[in-house]
Amino acid sequence: MKESILDVLLYLFEHYFSEDADLVRDRDSLQNGLIQAGFSPAEISKAFDWLDALSEQRPSVARPHVDGPVRIYHGPELDKLDVDCRGFLLFLEQHRILDADQRELVLDRAMALDQDELDLDDLKWVVLMVLFNQPGAEAAYAWMETQMFLDEPESVH
């Protein structure tokens, strides 16, 4: 049996969402497919709750990128996100892949995962899922998706 919410989310993303964004499946058929893949109903339910929270937090209008204050991490965020993760989020924001609202959404969704710590690869998947769900973020999503599968990350100009 697979154990974490992130495992369920990654499976959904890799097998359903990224293949055909227009594919509409009802929750029951997705749940049956996930159970057949070996996920527990409890983890599947948590993953759907995670996705529901993500879709509820979708901004209605994309705002232009503006330079804002530097994000200061605290307590549980420092425990869950190591220096590589925090540096990566700063990199994405400085290179306008994420805006401040999207960064906060990534942080919210990362903190909602049932893991004590996230590594950089896990955080990249969270970023990719958030960007996939953001209207107007197609270019940022495409750049991020490319970065996920390159051996050596490409710089942003």
Swiss-Prot record:
Source domain of life: Bacteria
Q: State the InterPro entries in the record.
A: Smg
List the transmembrane segments.
none
Family matches, as Pfam families: DUF494
Family per UniProt? Answer: Belongs to the Smg family.
Q: What is this protein called?
A: Protein Smg homolog
